[in-house]
Amino acid sequence: MTNPTDNPMVEPLIREFIARNILLSDTGFPHSDDVSFLQEGIIDSLGVMELVEFVQETFGVKVEQSEVTPEHFDSVTRLAAFVRRKAAAAESSAS
């Protein structure tokens, strides 16, 4: 499990997961970090569920069903920011 609060590897890990597990590509994530997964047809509803599981297992953050929205899961940038916010909130509540 990776501590994502200040980890620069959050975006690369997300890109790699999407490339390998959703796009089934060995050549990497072929889009910019701000590209909308939904508008570009990169991820469907099943892919979103895979992404939720990946985030929970890789970064150790709990994702509530109500948080699975385009605001949080529609681009690498948005997802990385969400992961960092969740990790920071978990750290502050554990203190």
Language-model-derived ranges and their functions:
Residues 4-8, 42, 70:
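Charge-dense, low-complexity intrinsically disordered segments
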Residues 52:
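Short-chain dehydrogenase/reductase
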Residues 49:
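Conserved catalytic core of two-component sensor histidine kinases
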Residues 22-42, 60-69, 92-95:
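Phosphopantetheine carrier-protein modules
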Residues 67-78:
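AMP-binding/adenylate-forming catalytic domain of the ANL superfamily
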Residues 2-30, 81-95:
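Thiotemplate assembly-line natural product biosynthesis machinery
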Residues 45:
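Catalytic nucleophile serine of serine hydrolases
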